[in-house]
Amino acid sequence: LFGLKAGQYPKSNRPLTLFEEGLNMVQIRQLCTLLYEQEKGSVVMVCSGNEAQGEYQYALGSSLMDMRALSKAMNGKLYGRGGGSSLMAQGTFRASRQSVMDVFQEETKS
């Protein structure tokens, strides 16, 4: 299923953001890993959550940028928690979808 979804996106050297409904943390990480390993984005962020509650679980993945630093920066701006390795970070943001997208775009600008 995730392979089909990943196939919908072309290879890209730009950041990729994906919001999906109803995924658990394992699925979020799997989809993020698949997308960044297939070079669908320079940095990939997959989120799943609830706009009404203002909470999104996330995974960030990249082989080109340190995900620990990105996660820390985004957590600070989005009332988030989480961490990880240089290749992948995961956690939860307490913010609106638009805020998450805006901060991701700001933090991944070249």
Place the predicted regions along the sequence by residue.
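Hard-cation-handling environments
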Residues: L1-R14
